Amino acid sequence: MSGDIAKGKKAFVQKCAQCHTVEQGGKHKTGPNLWGLFGRKTGQAEGFSYTDANKSKGIIWSEETLMVYLENPKKYIPGTKMIFAGIKKKTERADLIAYLKSSTS
């Protein structure tokens, strides 16, 4: 399922930007900077303090893993500090993932 980058950017601004940045060299906020997200293992953004749950999950971020994670983060990684409840609509998750893919590499 391919998403709409413009809609994904809007979703990022509304739901994610309070805690995350996407640009290369962007600062960590409450959540880590997301530059280089795709292909990276959970809990590996340099200079960010992760929970053991994030560090030990050991999955690689991809369109597929993000699709599941973003639906219910606490179910996918029990013990994560991310307090975001998740995005129930699959199309909205696809849009957000399309935006993240275009803006984090």
Swiss-Prot record:
The record's annotation in Gene3D superfamilies points to:
Cytochrome c-like domain
For this UniProt record, give its keywords in alphabetical order, as a comma-separated list: Electron transport, Heme, Iron, Metal-binding, Mitochondrion, Respiratory chain, Transport
The family assignment reads: Belongs to the cytochrome c family.
Name the InterPro entries for this protein.
Cyt_c-like_dom, Cyt_c-like_dom_sf, Cyt_c_1A/1B
Q: What does this protein do?
A: Electron carrier protein. The oxidized form of the cytochrome c heme group can accept an electron from the heme group of the cytochrome c1 subunit of cytochrome reductase. Cytochrome c then transfers this electron to the cytochrome oxidase complex, the final protein carrier in the mitochondrial electron-transport chain.
This protein's superkingdom?
A: Eukaryota
What subcellular compartments does it reside in? Mitochondrion intermembrane space
What is this protein's record name?
A: Cytochrome c-b
Post-translation: what modifications? Answer: Binds 1 heme c group covalently per subunit.
- One term of GO molecular function: electron transfer activity
Q: Where does heme c bind?
A: C16, C19, H20, M82
Q: Might you report a single GO cellular component term? A: mitochondrial intermembrane space
